[in-house]
Amino acid sequence: MLTEELLQDIFELADLMSNGDRELFLQLRDVVFASDPNQILNSIERILEPDSFDDFLDRVGESEKENLWLILIKLLEHFDYICVRDYKDNLEDFIYFFDRLHQVRNSGISLKLDSDGLNPAASISEWARVIDSKYLYEHFCLGAVDIDTDSYYLFFSKQATFARLQELAGNLGY
């Protein structure tokens, strides 16, 4: 059962991760408060790309809380607040998708223009450490959402926002 506190935390997470994106909020609200499961699926199918929708269907389970978390993550991905990268990603693709994140673009950062320290032979976790150190004094960090896959669900945020995101995710059991 979804509690009022859980819903508040989900909506605050959405607000913080999307910088108050109204379209994302409205999509999340429509899905969360839909009374018919088919209406939820139809809404999600209209929003997501076919591959992302298939992945969503593969992950849907019995837990309302876990399904709501999955919906939030998929919406954030769709609106470019999260990028999903395979653990074996190459640096060129990583940079391309990182640079597309809204928070990255809004901050004026571009790894394509400033990739100093990023070793093409390294892994995503090593690139994340470089990014964190590169933007430490600007108070940004690269975060990841764990949804139990081999992929990284990455987002970029202010460090103070990241602390609140961790707290909210912890409240939800993540």
Where do the protein language model's features map onto the residues?
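Acidic, proline/glycine-rich low-complexity IDRs
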Residues: 1-5, 119-174
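N-terminal "domain-start" segment
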Residues: 1-103
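Short glycine-rich, low-complexity/disordered patches
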Residues: 22-32, 42, 108-119, 137-149
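Generic alpha-helix signal with a bias toward terminal, lower-confidence helices
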Residues: 40, 44, 56, 60, ...
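Surface-exposed, low-hydrophobicity interaction/linker segments
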Residues: 76-141
